Structure formats: structure tokens, C-alpha cells
């Protein structure tokens, strides 16, 4: 029985140069593991709270308080617990914090311990993390949803939509999907250069040109796909993350592309995009608290496209359950740091799948070299993963881990491909 013997923590830097928490766990059998916690740029109001230091150091973003929470309170509370009883460990963390949003000890402190314990237990069992968490049937490799053009909070431009993604749905394997996405990414750089547009990068490795708006960005990506030798909609489809909470003003509406719009007008805009482009997925098309607008949008176009709830659900089983009851969205974005423990994340995924919702595993804009979400995507069979462009090592680390997993699975590996998007009708391709 692997027992937690030592717990350590330190402050490290994420991909945006901001501090984050890294936790190390040692077990009585000599097993050692570490986990690093990501951080978001566009965050939902209902997420688990990150504990930051305030003050002048690192512009107030230091995490020494969270590190001390691990060393002084969390560590002593979990030392002696059985590492392979993840639910027991995570419940101890939740109980110790005692707040609904993990604001006392910090979601960043709690998550670091939760993930490090899981990784240590997997190593102790001599199993890869995806197999330890997913069991013997974990074999589905996800479609990489590559954010190759950045806007919104991820780029300093006038583009309101936060992420423009390509999805290599027609590839025969994950390795080929990764190649296709990388080739489209490089093709887009050439297209942007020809148009005299910037090829500077946003937070997640995608290009951040200051283009006229949504359709202009989609047209550029369409050209890049075809210039790379692929068929738009058959080989490679498109997806969006609007992050609409970022341009929503309570009581006023959605300040989008030069005008203020209602939820109904935004729905009309998205419906128009579906008629013009092969879109398989739209994330956060409306604000996190616009439940009525979400329900109406889902009823209107939810049978034609995947509508992913990120800020509206924040990987929280309780909010997801409410959304399911109200007919909000048809897919869940999964971010482990939104809820703060691995167990709660797995519970949210299980609820989504049981209710007919798809799931998309996701990184954050402030990432590290930690590859846990790659294993988690295969473990839960999400069929989709969003972890940035095929650039910047903190993004590529996840893709490279998925290559290793596919290789390890051998003939048992199956790439999700277009089966990950059943609402994307054949006649639209």
C-alpha cells in the first residue's frame, strides 16, 4: 500500500512569466512525482480561487502563500494517507480548505497536491498515468484542437473571438493529425506574410494578426488549410472559442465587432457562420451567466454544432448538472484547475458523458511543461484536447506525450477523428 510520506512545494514560472505552484510527493515505497499547476487569462467568475500574494513582488502574482499552505497545512494533513485512494485524498483536501471555492488554501495549492498524488500512485503501480486513471480500456486518442490564430484576451489586437482552431478530423491517427495541424500552422504563417499581417504569437502559440474580424480570420485559415494541401471541412475542420464573457457587459449586452448585440443577435451571427464555414465546435459563445441565452442558442443550433461550456460550467459538477437541466450547451470543457481536484474533475466528466454531453480536455493560457492533461484526455476518452498551437514547448509537451501514448498503445490505439463531432453533419462538409 503506497503511503504518502513527504510533501514539498515551490514557486516556479509558467509560460507567461507568472509564478505558479509546483508540488512534489514522495511515497513510502520510494516513489516520487511532481505536478505543476496552470493558470488562465480569461477566467470564469465561478472557478476555484487561486491564492496569490498581492504586494509588489511579481506584480502581486506571487504564490508563496499557496506554497506555504502546502507545506504548513496540506502536507501534514495528507501524510500517512493511502496514495492510491484518490477520492479519499481529495476529500481530505476539500474538507481541510472548508470553503466552496477553495479560497482559504487556494485552488492552486490544492490541485498541485491532488495531481502529484495521482502521478505518484501511478508510478507506484508501475502504470502510465493514462492507464492508472482510465483502466485497461483507455485507448482513444483525442483530436487536437489547435489554436492557430489568437484574439481576445490571448492577443493584443482588435479581434474579439479569443481562439480560432483547426481540427484535423480526417487524419487516420493522432500522429498524422499532429502533422496535418503543424503543416496548416506553417501554411498560415506564409499566408499572413503574403497579406502583410503580423506573425507575432499570442499566449498559446497561435498567430495574433490584427485582422478585420471573425470572417476575415476564418477565411485566412481556410486559405492556409487548402494551401497546405488539405480539404477544408473533410480533412481539417474549424472551431472557435468566443470567450464571450470577456466582451459581455451586464445590462448592456455583447460589445462585439463594433456594435452592441443581444444574445439573440449573437445567435444569428453564429448561425450565419455555420452556413458559411465547416465549424465543428463553438466554445463559450455567450456569457457565463446568460443561462437563458445559452438555452435558446442550444435549442437553435445545438443539433448542428458542438456548443462547449467553459466559463458557464467551470468543470463544476453542480453547475454542469444545472446546465443539463436547463438545456445549456452540449459539451463540457475540462480544466482541472477550475474545480481544483482530480476527483471533482473526473466526476464532472462522468456526469457529462452520462448525460450525452461531449468533453474536451483543455490547457490554460498560463501553462507549464506538465503533461497531465494529455494522459487525462486518453484516460477519460474525451476524444478532444485543446492545448494550443503546435509551437512553444509548454504546448508541444502535451502533444508529444500523446504521441508517446499512441505508440505505447500500438494496434489498440484509436484516433477519435470525425467521430468526436457527431453533430457535424456529413452534408455540411
UniProtKB/Swiss-Prot annotation:
Active site: 204 (proton donor), 335 (proton acceptor)
This protein's record includes keyword Magnesium: yes
Subcellular location per the Swiss-Prot or TrEMBL entry: Cytoplasm; Secreted; Cell surface
Keyword Cytoplasm: yes
One Pfam family linked to the record: Enolase_N
Protein residues bound to Mg(2+): 241, 283, 310
Protein purpose: Catalyzes the reversible conversion of 2-phosphoglycerate (2-PG) into phosphoenolpyruvate (PEP). It is essential for the degradation of carbohydrates via glycolysis.
Organism the protein comes from: Mycolicibacterium paratuberculosis (strain ATCC BAA-968 / K-10) (Mycobacterium paratuberculosis)
Annotated (2R)-2-phosphoglycerate binding sites: 162, 335, 364-365, 386
PROSITE patterns listed in its UniProt record: ENOLASE
Protein name per Swiss-Prot or TrEMBL: Enolase
GO-annotated biological processes: glycolytic process
Cofactors (names): Mg(2+)
GO molecular function, a single term: magnesium ion binding
Alphabetical list of InterPro entries matching this protein: Enolase, Enolase-like_C_sf, Enolase-like_N, Enolase_C, Enolase_CS, Enolase_N
EC number(s) stated in the UniProt entry for this protein: 4.2.1.11
Any one of the GO CC terms: phosphopyruvate hydratase complex
Main location: cytoplasm
The protein's annotated pathway: Carbohydrate degradation; glycolysis; pyruvate from D-glyceraldehyde 3-phosphate: step 4/5
Family statement drawn from the similarity comment of this UniProt entry: Belongs to the enolase family.
Catalytic activity: (2R)-2-phosphoglycerate = phosphoenolpyruvate + H2O
Keywords: Cytoplasm, Glycolysis, Lyase, Magnesium, Metal-binding, Secreted
Annotated cofactor note: Binds a second Mg(2+) ion via substrate during catalysis.
